[in-house]
Amino acid sequence: MNFIRQQNYGWAMALPLGLNYFTTSDLPPEKLLKQMWRDVYDCFDQALFDTYDAEMQSFLLHLGSFEQVTPAMAAAVTGMDTASATLLRLLDLGSYMIPDDEGGYVVQPFMHAYLMDVQRRKCSSEFIAEQFDRAANFWRGQGKLQRALEYYHRAGNTDQILILLREESRKKASAACFAELKGYYDLLPNETIQAYPELMSGMCMICSLR
């Protein structure tokens, strides 16, 4: 049962449902849990996603990868003028998300896992990467460097990571800031870092902190 507790995404029904699966099957725990979630997601499809109108389905497919979202970010990613109202519709449904302290919303872990599953089944990897790019562009415009870098990384967009790191190094950011950026410097090949003086400067700052 510890195996289920560790992978229940905070969903209260996972434990009793998992108990039923584990007592009626001889499959290994990993395969059994995978089958349980597949059955659960199929039920969610029938009871939730498949019943929504095309606008709501599109909205969820655009935002399925995000654990947190603000109305402004949702509008930037989806391109929908009705993004704020659609988020309120989701909030009224009661299961998808809860308000956070920043005026946005945190998606419930088990619903986030479900929406990512829907997105993977219905969308191309290029589409998913594009949504991360849009989110990164939004947070970049808001001056939120770490969030922008995180989403460019999840989009696999090393070109934009390179540009952002060069821009940040030119600002002569604090040593503490460079320490936070180390993981993104590590994504770049050594020859790329060596080709740009500002990146070499940033890397030297990072090395001095060790």
Map each language-model feature to its residues:
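Short, polar/flexible loop-turn hinges at active-site or ligand-entry regions and domain interfaces
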Residues: L27-E30, M80, R120-S125
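C-terminal helical "lid" of AAA+/P-loop NTPase domains
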Residues: N2-Q7, M13-L27, S58-H62, A72-V77, ...
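Residue-level detector of well-ordered alpha-helical segments, enriched
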Residues: M13-G18, E55-F59, T86, Q131, ...
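Extended alpha-helical scaffolding segments used for macromolecular assembly and cargo binding
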Residues: S125-S208
